[in-house]
Design a protein with these regions (language model features):
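A short acidic-Thr-Gly-centered motif at the start of a beta-strand
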Residues: 1-7
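Aspartic protease core domain of the pepsin/retropepsin superfamily
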Residues: 7-9, 14-97
Length: 97
């Protein structure tokens, strides 16, 4: 996937309730983001917890020739730029059997 000349690596994670984007990508691509009224904690696969305070609303996502929109919580993701979670999969009825 590309965003303003950037190639992004995306993980589709069936264990994630929500979708996320790295703060590095938010900054590099100068994405408009908003602050939650109330922050919340996320437990990562490593059992560490991180606070989520900001999100990108209605991000246009292009995968191959498929264009869609996704709300992305901003969270450091390690080796991935974006994580697509169950919120997006359920919205688009893309549940695995």
């Amino acid at each position: 996937m590309y965003d303003k000349g950037q190639t992004l690596s995306i993980l589709i994670d069936l264990g994630a309730s929500f979708s996320y984007i790295s703060p590095i990508i938010v900054e590099l691509c100068k994405l408009v983001h908003e602050k939650f009224d109330k922050s919340w904690m996320v437990q990562l696969a490593t059992c560490t917890k991180r606070k989520v305070t900001n999100y990108v609303k209605d991000y246009e996502l292009l995968m191959n020739d498929f264009i869609t929109h996704v709300d992305l919580n901003i969270l450091p993701l390690g080796s991935y730029d974006m994580l697509i979670g169950m919120d997006w999969l359920e919205k688009h009825r893309l549940m695995p059997n």
